[in-house]
Design a protein with these regions (language model features):
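N-terminal structural segment of carbohydrate-active enzymes
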Residues: 1-83, 88-92, 98, 127-143, ...
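Active-site-proximal helices and loops of the catalytic beta/alpha 8
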Residues: 3, 17-23, 34-36, 41-50, ...
Length: 301
């Protein structure tokens, strides 16, 4: 059973400070924001954390040393540390040239055109061909390219060596599966230096068949349902539903509704994620007795 707390945009040194409370609240996993070097370390735009220049570790969220210290301390509390890994795309050049890689992007990637997907934007999310072969508003990486795979595997193993217990694969739905001609997920997940207790990929608005295919390689973070509830991680709210201008459908929901719905999820699903609402007074709701009670109750069969 996994009770995951997403402390989005929270510095690692603060996550470390919160570990006693996280443990007391019944969370056994904490998810931290992407740590890859991004095109700017500005705190004004949260989405810039999802515009990495490559796979070098260290940004305003924290350093390698701070991550190592966090993992070491979390182990004392029996808490897994999960890092959000941006593996589908890199930073863009500008808002106008949004499918062009930023000039400071990893040089080896820039010098190999085959490292990138075709410069076409997804316009129909119901078209699987577009979802896996086009871009989602940023320069998409070619998951079948051996250079791309090696760089991602090297980064993930560097995280593993620092003590990380798992990963969230951002935009996993846009990375093709073996039956679609792509060996990315088996290659990457089977190349880690050690077994990890929790790896999950973001696959939103998906049918049961697609979820089951991704679940062969990892758990699936989703707002959809599945026949095998142990294969998925459910949430009421995430960063996109709260912060995004286009997808922010939970922004107007009161914290009482979020907590109520989370309690219902936790009663029926073995794996759940609670998003701490950053930049607001509601951020502290994850510390409420209601959330604690939901996490510590047994899941109904």
């Amino acid at each position: 059973m996994n009770r995951i707390l997403s402390l989005f945009d929270c510095p690692l040194k603060d996550v470390k400070r919160f570990l006693p409370i996280i443990s007391r609240q019944g969370f056994n996993t904490v998810q931290v924001s992407p740590l890859q070097k991004c095109k700017t370390d500005s705190k004004d735009s949260w989405y810039l954390l999802y515009q990495p220049l490559g796979f070098e570790i260290g940004n305003r969220i924290g350093t390698k040393e701070e991550l190592y210290d966090l993992c070491l301390e979390a182990k004392k509390y029996g808490i897994n540390v999960v890092v959000d890994a941006v593996i589908n795309h890199v930073a863009n050049k500008s808002e106008k040239e949004f499918l062009e890689p930023h000039p400071d992007t990893d040089e080896e990637l820039l010098s190999n055109k085959d490292c990138f997907k075709e410069k076409k934007q997804i316009t129909n999310w119901d078209d699987r061909n577009q979802v896996i072969n086009y871009c989602l508003g940023l320069p998409g990486l070619n998951p079948n390219n051996p250079i791309v795979q090696k760089k991602i595997i090297d980064m993930l193993n560097e995280y593993v060596d620092l003590g990380v217990n798992g990963f969230r694969f951002d935009a996993a739905k846009s990375i093709a599966l073996p039956e679609e001609g792509c060996n990315f997920f088996p290659n990457v997940t089977y190349s880690l230096n050690r077994w990890l207790p929790i790896i999950y990929g973001e696959v939103l608005f998906a049918d049961n068949e697609l979820i089951e295919k991704y679940a062969r390689y990892m758990r699936v973070l989703t707002n959809s349902d599945a026949r095998d509830r142990n294969s998925i991680i459910k949430f009421v709210e995430n960063k996109d539903s709260f912060l995004s201008k286009d997808l922010g459908y939970t922004k107007q929901w009161p914290k009482s509704r979020i907590t109520r719905d989370y309690m219902i999820l936790a009663a029926h699903y073995p794996n759940t994620l609670y998003y701490a609402r950053n930049y607001t007074h509601d951020w502290y709701e994850w510390q409420s007795e209601f959330v604690k009670e939901a996490n510590l109750k047994l899941v109904k069969k």
